[in-house]
């Protein structure tokens, strides 16, 4: 009989969001008249902006003509989109990025999960705790993490706790880590990193010979002009960091699928013999081998995001979600909850009341208020006793959810 990859058996039972779905379904089946409000998974609710839709319609019509048909495109992405990405997201901030340093993909989740393939299995990873589960689970699948202990932590992962005590600003790894995962604005805590703190991270990575995997999927929600939107705003970051970006939350592409990864050519690793190798070239080889590229229609829609009218429309949507965040945050504070995040990110991180465990509060919130959120413990051991609410709901649902919570 063919053997399996036993690393999959090391995964904790059930991915966080399917488990939420299972519990919600069980409750819904037993309470069919319940009006459940979902503020859990970070899926957007507003439709695609008109400028994006029009661009995709035009692209679809192009594809229906002999002269405008596009078959396989460049796996790394079409130049028309990459040039807009560079001009808007980097050149405008004084950062120089070359076209062949940008890789367009169908989502940051895929990129964050797949990037570990170009690192040695001996590489030690460090993650902030609580953490987006994909960073950990994909390394478990690869065989890099060892076994999970009774405390929920994997033996070969360096955990960097982000707690109320350290203002959710984790200390540097206590032992050398080859790969450091950072996410700002942070999922799940909603916190951000200042320029001074990011500078410290870049300097630390240089000193230790580490690589930072910087997940910047929520940068468009930053309201404070003093907070960096890209790690490359920090001098020297191109020598130590890769950056993950997404159109999912920025422009409502959760169902359309488009993102990009920046890997500077200055970013190098080494072989066992000490030879330097470009991570850019390794990823290019991996990307072109395993990925056929994002569709032409989708990339034309993404290009429209950077048009003048496209920017107006997506900023209106971002403002809508951030107003939701404000309503959630203020409503929870009024109800007596201890709350974090929600000012430069679409996530609100709250302390569970009465010392409840995260899943206990999940069940209480669902059973009493018919509101669904995300248990903090699902993001790691340091998330126990916390809970995440998302600002991506419809306004009327957000208002109703807060009213229900305040009555609990």
From Swiss-Prot:
Residue numbers binding pyridoxal 5'-phosphate: 72, 108-109, 132, 187, 218, 246-248, 257, 292
Entry cofactors: pyridoxal 5'-phosphate
Swiss-Prot/TrEMBL keywords: Aminotransferase, Pyridoxal phosphate, Transferase
Pathway membership: Amino-acid biosynthesis; L-lysine biosynthesis via DAP pathway; LL-2,6-diaminopimelate from (S)-tetrahydrodipicolinate (aminotransferase route): step 1/1
The organism's place on the tree of life at top rank: Bacteria
UniProt-listed Enzyme Commission number(s): 2.6.1.83
Catalytic activity, as annotated: (2S,6S)-2,6-diaminopimelate + 2-oxoglutarate = (S)-2,3,4,5-tetrahydrodipicolinate + L-glutamate + H2O + H(+)
GO biological process: lysine biosynthetic process via diaminopimelate, diaminopimelate-aminotransferase pathway
Gene Ontology molecular function: L,L-diaminopimelate aminotransferase activity; pyridoxal phosphate binding
Sequence similarity: Belongs to the class-I pyridoxal-phosphate-dependent aminotransferase family. LL-diaminopimelate aminotransferase subfamily.
Protein's name in the database: LL-diaminopimelate aminotransferase
Organism listed in the record: Leptospira biflexa serovar Patoc (strain Patoc 1 / ATCC 23582 / Paris)
């Amino acid at each position: 009989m063919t053997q399996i990859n036993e690393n999959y058996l090391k995964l904790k039972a059930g991915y966080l969001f399917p488990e939420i779905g299972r519990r919600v379904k069980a409750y819904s089946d037993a309470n069919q008249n319940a009006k459940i409000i979902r503020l859990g998974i970070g899926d957007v609710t507003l439709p695609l902006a008109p400028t994006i839709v029009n661009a995709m319609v035009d692209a679809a019509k192009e594809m229906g003509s002999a002269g405008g048909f596009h078959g396989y495109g460049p796996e790394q992405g079409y130049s028309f989109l990459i040039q807009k990405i560079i001009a808007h997201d980097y050149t405008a901030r004084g950062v120089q990025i070359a076209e062949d340093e940008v890789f367009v993909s169908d989502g940051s989740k895929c990129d964050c999960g797949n990037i570990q393939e170009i690192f040695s299995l001996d590489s030690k990873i460090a993650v902030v705790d609580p953490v987006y589960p994909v960073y950990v689970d994909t390394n478990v699948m690869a065989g890099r993490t060892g076994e999970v202990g009774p405390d929920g932590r994997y033996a070969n992962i360096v955990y960097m706790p982000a707690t109320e005590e350290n203002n959710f600003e984790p200390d540097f790894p206590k032992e050398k880590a080859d790969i450091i995962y950072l996410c700002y604005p942070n999922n799940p805590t909603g916190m951000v990193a200042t320029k001074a703190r990011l500078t410290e991270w870049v300097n630390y990575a240089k000193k230790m010979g580490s690589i930072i995997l910087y997940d910047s999927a929520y940068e468009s929600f930053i309201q404070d002009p003093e907070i960096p939107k890209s790690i490359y705003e920090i001098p020297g970051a191109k020598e130590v960091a890769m950056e993950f970006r997404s159109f999912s939350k920025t422009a409502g592409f959760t169902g359309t699928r488009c993102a990009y990864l920046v890997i500077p050519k200055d970013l190098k690793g080494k072989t066992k013999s000490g030879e330097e190798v470009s991570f850019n070239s390794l990823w290019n080889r991996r990307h072109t081998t395993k990925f056929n590229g994002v569709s032409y229609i989708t990339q034309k829609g993404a290009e429209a995001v950077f048009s003048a009218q496209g920017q107006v429309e997506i900023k209106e949507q971002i403002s809508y979600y951030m107003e939701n965040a404000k309503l959630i945050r203020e409503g929870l504070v009024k109800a007596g909850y201890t709350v974090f995040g929600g000012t430069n990110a679409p996530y609100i991180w709250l302390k569970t009341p009465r010392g409840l465990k995260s899943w206990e509060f999940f069940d209480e919130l669902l059973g009493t208020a018919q509101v669904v959120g995300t248990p903090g413990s699902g993001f790691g051991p340091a998330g126990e006793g916390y809970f995440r609410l998302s600002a991506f709901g419809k306004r009327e649902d957000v208002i109703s959810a807060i009213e229900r919570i305040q009555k609990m």
